[in-house]
């Protein structure tokens, strides 16, 4: 599972997730991708479950890129604890994802296989997603 090796602060503020993602909106490494249509926190367990679903369907063919990383800790207090007496203990790690961000990329498989693998992965995630393809730059080649 994805977790940071070292962090400066164990407990973080929750923060706001307004607007669209600043970067990572296009498919860059692979040929096909899975793009988030709304903003949400995605846990390291959800990322791992989606990765396993994709690789199982592709049967060890192709390559998968995970474009998000869970660098933000979230905390929780024990059940039955009264208000006050400080912030809770770190519970897990999340990747804050804004709408428009490409979450996963795939290459080395056909479009049908990629579409189905990413559909299976999307069922493991708490965000609405859509299948996207890499946009080719320029229509004609300038060679020779």
Curated annotation (Swiss-Prot):
Name of this chain's protein: Large ribosomal subunit protein uL16
The record's GO CC annotations read: cytosolic large ribosomal subunit
Q: What does this protein do?
A: Binds 23S rRNA and is also seen to make contacts with the A and possibly P site tRNAs.
Q: Which family does it belong to?
A: Belongs to the universal ribosomal protein uL16 family.
Query: What are the entry keywords?
Result: Ribonucleoprotein, Ribosomal protein, RNA-binding, rRNA-binding, tRNA-binding
> Which BP terms does GO give this entry?
translation
Has the keyword rRNA-binding been applied to this entry? yes
Q: Which HAMAP family match?
A: Ribosomal_uL16
One GO MF annotation is:
structural constituent of ribosome
- Lineage top rank: taxon: Bacteria
Signal peptide residues on this chain, from the entry's feature table? none
Quick check: keyword Ribonucleoprotein in the entry? yes
Pfam families per record: Ribosomal_L16
List the source organism.
Answer: Ligilactobacillus salivarius (strain UCC118)
Q: Which PANTHER family match?
A: 50S/60S RIBOSOMAL PROTEIN L16, LARGE RIBOSOMAL SUBUNIT PROTEIN UL16M
Q: Quaternary arrangement and interactors, per the entry? A: Part of the 50S ribosomal subunit.
